[in-house]
UniProtKB/Swiss-Prot annotation:
Subcellular location: Secreted
Keywords noted in UniProt: Calcium, Cell adhesion impairing toxin, Disulfide bond, Glycoprotein, Hemorrhagic toxin, Hemostasis impairing toxin, Hydrolase, Metal-binding, Metalloprotease, Platelet aggregation inhibiting toxin, Protease, Pyrrolidone carboxylic acid, Secreted, Signal, Toxin, Zinc, Zymogen
Binding annotation for Zn(2+): 334, 338, 344
Binding of Ca(2+) 2, residues: 404, 407, 409, 411, 414, 417
PROSITE patterns the record matches: ADAM_MEPRO, DISINTEGRIN_1, DISINTEGRIN_2, ZINC_PROTEASE
Stated name of the protein: Zinc metalloproteinase-disintegrin-like bothropasin
GO molecular-function terms, A-Z: metal ion binding; metalloendopeptidase activity; toxin activity
Ranges for domain Disintegrin: 402-488
Enzyme class at the top of the EC tree: hydrolase
Signal peptide: 1-20
Pfam family, one: ADAM_CR
Record: glycosylation sites: 372
Length: 610
């Protein structure tokens, strides 16, 4: 039996319309005053935690009733989350705060399938929600003895600088065809089925300028970073990504690098510091520097492309140019998108009626959606580069808070969790106890069919290539066995290539991916340009210097293709972009000669390469 506790707050019958007010989000020139009413459902006799796992609020927007459903973002912090700041004398102070009972939520609006919400409930409700295809912000008015909140739109916040803002990544494409092709591709339902979530362990660094900007209030800075991470987490789920905050470092006694308006200098400096300092202290996948400095020109963010999991380049820098959390979080998600191999959108790309996250300029309304191009490029990066660091999924045993039956999270001690009895749609699961119903062997999993284990030999994960055999159910478990690849170096595609991390990389496929049909591997003579060591022809980079290929290594540098497509006659076609010099290089593991593969810009014996 569920006992419903109503926490009733006076709800204005006709919301007050305000003309202008100064809030944390800025000077708002048109807003609506609402009085949220909280409705909490707890099992009878249960002790109410400080912040429930699920909450519901009712209020009015434009005179119409709104029901906001919230669920705690339990994956916001990693189990080993840490915070570091520095004493005035420079001493490093690292703590591991208890963050299980936090106050950061994702949610939706009742009866609005297209709605989303990201809310901090620490002191009233602060955040944003999408209602009937429009984004609204909500924030406490901080009046004494009042539960009044302001609801407003982004367009009603006064902007200090109306000039267009943009990402610092510039695209100097030799051809827009790869983007055009990506916009026309469709990821099949079968591919989506076998596309597991990726998990980015995010580390945020805050520079001293941010400390000064916030008058040294470290608690205020921490709260803002939590809110930003919560929004980034919400945005990334559309890419089948989950971002967990593993650490926060505040440069409270001085910057650890020289932070300059020059984004190239600052990004490289931060990347080097991350590699030589931060990574030696804290394991993480991706780091972002938030700074109060005003970058040169209209730039507010900058990142390396296709660098996720790289020990140095898996970083981004973001200017904290707006007091509105959603606006800054969008830039953080945008720059992480670059790290995930995503380029700026073009006219060929779409995300419905909304502005897209990866647009090169910041739109008048904050974006929250990745385009079709972004999804394909991210998928392509993951499949080709196989970044290993984002594959480690947090286990159920990593959830340190007590299990809560009905929250749709499978936790320790539960056999299943399909939500509340009213919402459960799993015929195998008893929603009241989170145990399997009598006669059921399973309630979920790729090897669970009609509450029974799938027959032994049933395919549960398709083969993605000759080097990635399909996995089959064992008949003894509801889970598909772990994804296993053929051994690196095993011949594939009739000896045209060798297996590498589940793929069979050959130059023909790489030419096709860059330029399309009727394009093939070029003659050996074309690859001699890689001996020049110039801006495009080289084998690898060491300390920022481009190293020319040795004669025996020329097929492990820039990729050259022969274009036989209609209207083309280019025997030595190559791809080069200033903003992503790595794109167009021969991929690691590619066959460069009989019995040899590319490894770190060298053509080495396959027997010793792995």
């Amino acid at each position: 039996m569920i006992e419903v506790l109503l926490v009733t707050i006076c709800l204005a019958a006709f919301p007050y319309q305000g003309s202008s007010i100064i809030l944390e989000s800025g000077n708002v020139n048109d807003y609506e005053v609402v009085y949220p009413r909280k409705v909490t459902a707890l099992p009878k006799g249960a002790v109410q935690p400080k912040y429930e796992d699920a909450m519901q609020y009712e209020f009015k927007v434009n005179g119409e009733p709104v029901v906001l459903h919230l669920e705690k973002n339990k994956g916001l912090f990693s189990k080993d989350y840490s915070e570091t700041h520095y004493s005035p004398d420079g001493r490093e102070i690292t703590t591991y705060p208890a963050v299980e009972d936090h106050c950061y939520y994702h949610g939706r609006i009742e009866n609005d399938a297209d709605s989303t919400a990201s809310i901090s409930a620490c002191n009233g409700l602060k955040g944003h929600f999408k209602l009937q295809r429009e984004t609204y912000f909500i924030e406490p008015l901080k009046l004494s003895n009042s539960e009044a909140h302001a609801v407003f739109k982004y367009e009603n916040v006064e902007k200090e600088d109306e000039a267009p803002k943009m990402c610092g990544v510039t695209q100097n494409w030799k051809s827009y065809e790869p983007i055009k092709k990506a916009s026309q591709l469709v990821v099949t339902a079968e591919q989506q089925k076998y596309n597991p979530f990726r998990y980015v362990e995010l580390f945020i660094v805050v520079d001293q300028g941010m400390v000064t900007k916030n008058n040294g209030d470290l608690d205020k800075i921490k709260a803002r970073m939590y809110e930003l991470a919560n929004i980034v987490n919400e945005i990334l789920r559309y890419l089948y990504m989950h971002a967990a905050l593993v650490g926060l470092e505040i440069w409270s006694n001085g910057d650890k690098i020289t932070v300059k308006p020059d984004v190239d200098y600052t990004l490289n400096s931060f990347a080097e510091w991350r590699k030589t300092d931060l990574l030696t202290r804290k394991k993480h996948d991706n780091a972002q520097l938030l700074t109060a400095i005003d970058f040169n020109g209209p730039t507010i963010g900058y990142a390396y492309i296709g660098s996720m999991c790289h020990p140095k380049r898996s970083v981004a820098i973001v200017e904290d140019y707006s007091p509105i959390n959603l606006v800054v979080a969008v830039i953080m998600a945008h720059e992480m998108g670059h790290n995930l191999g995503i380029h700026h959108d073009t006219d060929f790309c779409s995300c419905g009626d909304y502005p897209c996250i990866m647009g090169p300029t910041i739109s008048n309304e904050p974006s929250k959606f990745f385009s079709n191009c972004s999804y394909i490029q991210c998928w392509d990066f993951i499949m080709k580069e196989n970044p290993q660091c984002i594959l480690n999924e947090p286990l159920g045993t990593d959830i340190v808070s007590p299990p809560v039956c009905g929250n749709e999270l499978l936790e320790v001690g539960e056999e299943c969790d399909c939500g509340t009895p009213e919402n459960c749609q799993n015929e195998c699961c008893d929603a009241a106890t989170c145990k399997l119903k009598s006669g059921s062997q399973c309630g979920h999993g790729d090897c669970c069919e009609q509450c029974k284990f799938s027959k032994s030999g049933t395919e549960c994960r398709a083969s993605m290539s000759e080097c990635d055999p399909a996995e089959h159910c064992t008949g003894q478990s509801s889970e598909c066995p772990a994804d296993v690849f053929h051994k690196n170096g095993q011949p594939c595609l009739d000896n045209y290539g060798y297996c590498y991390n589940g793929n069979c990389p050959i130059m023909y496929h790489q030419c096709y991916a860059l330029f399309g049909a009727d394009v093939y591997e070029a003659e050996d003579s074309c690859f001699k340009d890689n001996q020049k060591g110039n801006y495009y022809g080289y084998c690898r980079k060491e300390n920022g210097k481009k190293i020319p290929c040795a004669p025996e290594d020329v097929k492990c540098g820039r990729l050259y293709c022969k274009d036989n497509s209609p209207g083309q006659n280019n025997p030595c076609k190559m791809f080069y972009s200033n903003d992503d010099e790595h794109k167009g290089m021969v991929l690691p593991g590619t066959k460069c000669a009989d019995g040899k593969v590319c490894s770190n810009g060298h053509c080495v014996d396959v027997a010793t390469a792995y």
